[in-house]
């Protein structure tokens, strides 16, 4: 196999592997285009949450997780790439281009992360009574920082304020018929390869300090009697509030989440409070105005006595990877 053929195969495989990435409501709002010497990441407007995410914050964060997954997949195959973010100001859907590909030594750490992609999932159940080791928090924080964002661990008073803020955001969205219609749509799409099936949604609200999202309908996931006393809450944030920074926030989320998976720490992203402008501003005040909030994260150790929820469905590779330019 020629090096050109090896490269296009690696690019296609990296794009397919990126399909494991998490996304808001499992919308998977991305599409990849494989070129002879590059890989392009594009957003898909049809899978944007136009009611709850009109500016595309969470769309860009979601696509950023896929971008980071693809970067790791290439490194695991022995390829180094240069990332061009938002390379064409006249093409808003083109979010990133992986280019200037060079063969290099296979990265064992990236290979381990690719394995973590296949087991990573969102578990909305309360966490166990086992505390998260401080060393794990430090390692997760370093992974986020390496991608240009920050992870602020919240103290007890800040957690209570986040809880009130999340509750208020949920109330605001519950009173918005467009948001409720949108949520109903994405919780009834599992047979299409996107959305959230009943098996991953709580059958009743969890007894946690920071409330989870009200999905508008009960699911089939038992919550159990646990609480979140041993959970660690953190805020993913950065210096800017622009599309480039939202994309990088997704890359940082992916890096932190995969690191957490490797360390046996569960992660639940809580996005409702950043979807509502007023509550997003409240979160910013917790940062003393020194950054912009991207997501609230709950970190914890899952209860080993109960099996976790299944993985959410995924679109097929053919639906998200365009290889027509290299056939």
Predicted features and spans:
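Acidic, surface-exposed loops and disordered segments
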Residues: 1-327
